[in-house]
């Protein structure tokens, strides 16, 4: 199946290449042809300069362009789509893209307005939410729905109108309040780094979430606000809520403040579940820092959560939000996962060149070779020990025997430890 992605050089469109390329024949287009070709080459997919040409050759056409361009691109390419194909968009508003599809696509072309409720930094589809807002369900709908469920995604089906209302809460309201908070901090000339000395776990989580939103493309954030038809009402109610709360405090009306707080709490749903989830997040953050502090002076493996690269070394120190290894590598704690001892060992097996050495040692003939082998295989970083020879004859005194072991290990240090244990058993190295 041929999947075309208009807007495949950036953002979610680029992320979709990663998900699709192993299962489908993928081609992309982009506004910046130089960048588009580079991404296509890096991701090993085809590049097509013309949006309309890509539409004409695709079984499924994915529109992944900025919100403010989505409708115009749909109208541009819609008439060129071939019979039996399907158009999918991935923008975070649905009413206007749906209307454009209904008006510009031929009758024999299906369309499924969608909204993946996750960003381009998401590395796994498992348990991610995707919203479908179909008005018709043709042959393509079941195929798409089944594919998404096969990836363990949470598929929500609703109308475009209801979707946009829910997004006015999930995105418009939350983004507006977060950006307002960040803007207030900027106007107050707050030094965020200085507040870290006083931060509570909840403040820490809040700052990270706010930073995540304000660091997004500001044009994307703006169009999420301005192009959702429910936006004006949402922002008006938010401003009124802020004014009401401020007035209660300024007028020293504690009863009014408590009334507002209690009513707000009652509307927050399952409070115990929210407390449990936030406790888990706080515990996870604290556990990671505790684990790092306990590992100072010891070998550790840190996996970058975005690149997947594993950094191995002795942890020299944890300096604020940075972990520093003895080889000079500096990593932001927020961006790494501490691997377990078992995961570190497996990484070494997969990535370090194994050392092999044949070791001969003379023992009393009363020793039991299998016991020695079992003991040696328990040595740290020893992969395998094989008894290759038992010899009694010339050059070996009576009552003794020579045992030869082939030792496979991850380091020369491990092989030296094996030799030390052999001599500890009373053996004499040959």
Task: State what each model feature region is.
Residues 163-188, 196-214:
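Active-site-proximal catalytic alpha-helix in oxidoreductases
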Residues 53-100:
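Rossmann-fold NAD(P) dinucleotide-binding segment
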Residues 94, 101-160, 164-167:
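Rossmann-fold dinucleotide-binding core
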